[in-house]
């Protein structure tokens, strides 16, 4: 029976992410997939074969479909991730163990709040730890316990670490005058509301 399973995990602008486990287990049935060093070695070996095959096929593709003899089409293996969390398009995090053939141990994040400059420092540290724990396979109960402890500690944190470092523009547009105070109109962004409330304390 023809195998029609889709092994592609995620597609980005100019890259694709595939699970190497099915082909590794097919080629090496008795391999210990928990052996990180051995798995990395075998993945690089197979990726090199696939890379060479695809790059050779681009000559035919360029000639037959693009009607050109010379081209710059090239595919290259870059990263090996031990685990990943894909939230939605262009929002994911991965635990990288090999980067262009070099052994590493780092977190690769794209599009998530923890890499945004406007995200509060304390929450950034908290979510980074949560993401690292998820990728490391830490039990959910322990992660939930960490989050609850963080929530309890919020009252003790400096406001500089829990506030949003963002500008407040066009504040007047969201103000409606009340009895000696400034009221925020319906639909006012939260950081603009904060600025309006702060100004009320100065009145």
Describe the role of every protein-language-model region.
Residues 1-13, 21-203:
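DNA-dependent DNA polymerase catalytic subunits
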């Amino acid at each position: 029976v023809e195998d029609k399973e889709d092994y592609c995990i995620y597609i980005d602008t100019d890259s694709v992410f595939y699970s190497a486990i099915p082909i590794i287990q097919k080629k090496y049935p008795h391999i210990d997939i928990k052996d990180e060093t051995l798995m990395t070695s075998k993945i690089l070996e197979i990726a090199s074969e696939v890379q060479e095959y695809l790059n050779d096929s681009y000559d035919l593709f360029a000639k037959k479909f693009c009607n050109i003899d010379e081209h710059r089409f090239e595919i290259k293996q870059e990263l090996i991730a031990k685990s990943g969390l894909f939230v939605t398009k262009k929002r994911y995090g991965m635990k990288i163990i090999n980067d262009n053939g070099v052994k590493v141990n780092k977190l690769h994040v794209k599009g998530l709040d923890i890499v945004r400059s406007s995200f509060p420092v304390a929450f950034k540290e908290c979510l980074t730890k949560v993401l690292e724990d998820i990728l490391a396979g830490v039990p959910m109960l322990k992660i939930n316990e960490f989050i609850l402890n963080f929530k309890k500690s919020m009252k003790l944190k400096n406001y500089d670490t829990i506030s949003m470092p963002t500008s407040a523009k066009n504040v007047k547009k969201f103000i409606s005058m009340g009895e000696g105070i400034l009221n925020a109109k319906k639909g006012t962004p939260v950081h603009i509301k904060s600025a309006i409330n702060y100004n009320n304390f100065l009145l």
